[in-house]
Curated annotation (Swiss-Prot):
It comes from Thermosipho melanesiensis (strain DSM 12029 / CIP 104789 / BI429). GO terms for molecular function: protein-L-isoaspartate (D-aspartate) O-methyltransferase activity. This is Protein-L-isoaspartate O-methyltransferase. It is found in: Cytoplasm. Catalyzes the methyl esterification of L-isoaspartyl residues in peptides and proteins that result from spontaneous decomposition of normal L-aspartyl and L-asparaginyl residues. It plays a role in the repair and/or degradation of damaged proteins. GO terms for cellular component: cytoplasm. The keyword Transferase applies. GO terms for biological process: methylation; protein modification process; protein repair. The lineage of its organism: Bacteria, Thermotogati, Thermotogota, Thermotogae, Thermotogales. InterPro entries: PCMT, SAM-dependent_MTases_sf. Gene3D superfamilies: Vaccinia Virus protein VP39. The keyword Cytoplasm applies.
């Protein structure tokens, strides 16, 4: 279903993971007919589920591996976390934070339905990260920020990768930030459109 993602450099194992997690279960009833289209969709509460190509690109840029401990800021309906959970395997773990209680409940229910036991969903403010389980091998933020929060950099492990859209409501760039021997490097990947980190 997602073979077209190869043109974005998305690997076979990411495409396989996306095919295993049926997107239609992560969107509201009124947009289920569009679940397999490569577009973002509204999931209520002013939030969206990312287009499949964006999920694929972000998974690729995170370079997810077995055993990775991942922090996601912005669970939404849970689709991205579900895909990532397959990529890190049973020995890895996804910690995902959602501030909207209704979405948190929906995502938690979906994770149980899919038998995804390597995901911990937290109801709270993601701007502070999740110090209790830091450091993280990978951190992904699924909403834009005007700057890179220091708390997230502090919670990134050495040789870790942080993906975050940075900008404003009009222009956002997906940044890939690496920490190597305590030094931070930044790379601008592409222009994106996300909801704000609030």
């Amino acid at each position: 279903m997602y073979e077209h993602l190869k043109r974005y450099g998305v690997s076979k194992n990411i495409i396989e993971a996306m095919n295993k997690i049926d997107r239609k279960y992560f969107v509201p009833e009124n947009v289920k007919d569009l679940a397999y289209d490569d577009i973002p969709l509204p999931i209520g509460f002013g939030q969206t589920i990312s287009a499949p190509h964006m999920v694929g690109i972000m998974c690729k840029e995170l370079d997810l591996k077995e055993k990775d401990k991942v922090l996601e800021i912005g669970t939404g309906s849970g689709y991205n976390a579900a895909v990532m959970s397959l990529l890190v395997g049973k020995s890895g773990h996804i910690y995902t934070i959602e501030r909207i209680k209704q979405l948190y409940k929906i995502a938690t229910k979906r994770f149980k339905q899919f038998g995804l036991t390597n995901i911990t969903c937290i109801l709270g403010d993601g701007k502070e990260g999740f110090e209790e389980y830091a450091p993280f091998d990978k951190i992904v933020v699924t909403c834009y920020s005007k700057f890179v929060p220091n708390k997230l950099l502090e919670q990134l492990s050495d040789n870790g990768i942080l993906l975050i859209p940075v900008g404003d409501e009009f222009v956002q760039v997906l940044k890939k930030i690496k920490k190597i021997n305590g030094q931070i490097s930044e790379e601008d990947l592409l222009h994106v459109k996300f909801v704000p980190l609030v």
